[in-house]
């Protein structure tokens, strides 16, 4: 428990530093997390199989991640980002065809899924930080995901009676899930209220309800991401995706809920480039 607490605090410090600085610092951290997360997923889904070194399909994935992030760093164009995604998937298919029958079709699909699921979706953390007032907005992603995790755990411990997913995740309860969403929404409201009272940004009285809405919706999706990641682990009989974060497991173990929350939060916030428009 102590190890988990210490590593959790260190992780928050690193994230706070990266989020506050933004730019190349957050870019580098997000790229690193994406590369490690992709590696964990392809190992978990047997893309690498018995090979001790990365497979050809996996190497294409790494190159694709770097290319995709370079595009995201240099331009806001979704067209070029989509092109990087398409070329990466096509590259994986090319390796599959040229080396047939070295790889199975399932491995190619798993690699493509791993590329889209972790690196691409996580990039929306960096993109959210780049929005107007992004230094404040980006934390909504974590209030929705990790805030939900914490509240769901606390409520589940106190009131949990009805299983949410008995086979997939026996410890999760419906009461905990509801408490997680409500707690995340409350955190979002308090965060908006705190910003307003501190006078750090121009947020209207009406706009203050946008934060809890984003956090609440994000919390629902974060639990879906958590359960989906658990399903992948159970399908492949593994306990943790990795050991990078002591007491927590790997990147995918800690960021499974963030992955699906980030793009949804960004999509809403992108339509409102200033907080006063929310």
Locations of regions flagged by a protein language model:
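Conserved small/polar residues in nucleotide/adenosyl-binding loops
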Residues: 267-274
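Hydrophobic transmembrane alpha-helical segments of multi-pass transport and channel proteins
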Residues: 216-224, 251-259
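Membrane-embedded alpha-helical bundles of polytopic integral membrane proteins
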Residues: 1-216
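Interfacial loop-to-transmembrane junctions
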Residues: 236-256
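Membrane-embedded alpha-helical segments of transport systems
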Residues: 148-151, 178, 252-262
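Short helical (or helix-break) motifs at transmembrane helix termini and adjacent helical loops
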Residues: 146-157, 222-234
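Hydrophobic alpha-helical transmembrane segments of integral membrane proteins
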Residues: 116, 242, 259-260
């Amino acid at each position: 428990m102590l190890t988990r607490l210490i590593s959790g605090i260190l992780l928050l410090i690193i994230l706070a530093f990266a989020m506050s600085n933004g730019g190349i610092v957050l870019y580098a951290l997000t790229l690193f997390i994406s590369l490690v997360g992709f590696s964990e997923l392809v190992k978990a889904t047997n893309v690498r199989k018995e090979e001790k070194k990365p497979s050809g399909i996996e190497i294409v994935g790494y190159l694709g991640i770097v290319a995709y992030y370079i595009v995201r760093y240099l331009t806001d164009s979704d067209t070029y980002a989509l092109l990087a995604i398409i070329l990466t998937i096509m590259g994986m298919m090319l390796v599959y065809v040229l080396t047939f029958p070295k790889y199975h079709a399932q491995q190619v699909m798993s690699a493509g899924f791993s590329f889209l699921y972790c690196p691409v979706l996580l990039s929306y953390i960096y993109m959210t930080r780049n929005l107007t007032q992004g230094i404040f907005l980006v934390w909504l992603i974590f209030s929705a995901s990790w805030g939900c995790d914490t509240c769901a755990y606390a409520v589940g411990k106190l009131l949990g009676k009805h299983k949410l997913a008995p086979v997939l995740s026996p410890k999760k309860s419906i009461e905990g899930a509801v408490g997680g969403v409500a707690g995340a929404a409350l955190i979002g409201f308090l965060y908006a209220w705190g910003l307003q009272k501190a006078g750090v940004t121009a947020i209207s009285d009406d706009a203050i309800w946008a934060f809890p809405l984003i956090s609440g919706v994000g919390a629902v999706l974060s639990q879906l991401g958590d359960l989906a990641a658990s399903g992948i682990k159970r399908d492949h009989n593994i306990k943790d995706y990795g050991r990078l974060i002591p007491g927590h497991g790997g990147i995918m173990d800690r960021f499974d809920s963030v992955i699906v929350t980030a793009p949804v939060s960004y999509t809403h916030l992108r339509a409102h480039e200033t907080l006063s428009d929310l």
